[in-house]
C-alpha cells in the first residue's frame, strides 16, 4: 500500500505525498519501481527488456547510449543479447534495476527485490544496490522484512506496525559504509528492532 501511494497508483485518505515539489496524484516518470521478481519479458533480450522501460521520446543515438549506459551500470556488459532464461536470478534482477533506472527517476522504489534470491546472491545484490546508489545518488525507498538488510542498506529505517499500519519508530542509521554486520552498533540496532517485533508478536497486534 505504501509504495502504491508513493508511485501514485492509490490515493491517501488524508494528507499529501510529494516527490520534490510535485504532489503525487497519478503515476509519473519521477518514480521507478523494482519488484520481488524481475518480471522480464522472456522473449526479449536484455537490451530489449531495458529498452522497453524507456517512455521518453529520444533520438536513436541517445536511446542506444542510454540503454548501454544502464546495462553497464548494473554489470551486464556482454549480456546485451542474452534472454532471461539464460541469466541467473541475480542477473535478472540487475536487468529490472536497469529498466527502472533508464528513465532517470528521482525516486527508486524497491519492493522486497531480493526476497526470491538465495542468501549469497542476496548479499551480493545488496552490495550491488549500494554501488549503484553511490554512482546515481538516487533516493531509494526499500520495503523489506529482513532486518539486517534494512540496517545494511538504509540511512533511515521506518518501523511499521501491522493492522492498522502505523509508524512505530524511525531509526537513523548513522553507520559508515561499508557496514560490518557483526559491528557493535549494527547489532544494537538489530536487537532494538527484534525486540519490537517480538513484543508485537506476543501482544498479537
Go through the PLM ranges and name each one.
Residues 97:
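Hydrophobic anchor residue at the start of the ABC signature
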Residues 58-79, 131:
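Conserved ABC ATPase "signature" region
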Residues 15-27, 63:
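Conserved ABC transporter NBD signature motif
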Residues 7:
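Helix-to-loop junction immediately C-terminal to a conserved catalytic motif
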Residues 47-55, 64, 68, 172:
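Short helical segment in ABC ATPase nucleotide-binding domains corresponding to the A-loop/adjacent helical element
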Residues 82-85, 103:
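Conserved signature/switch motifs of ABC ATPase nucleotide-binding domains
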Residues 108-111:
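Catalytic Walker B motif of ABC-type/P-loop ATPase nucleotide-binding domains
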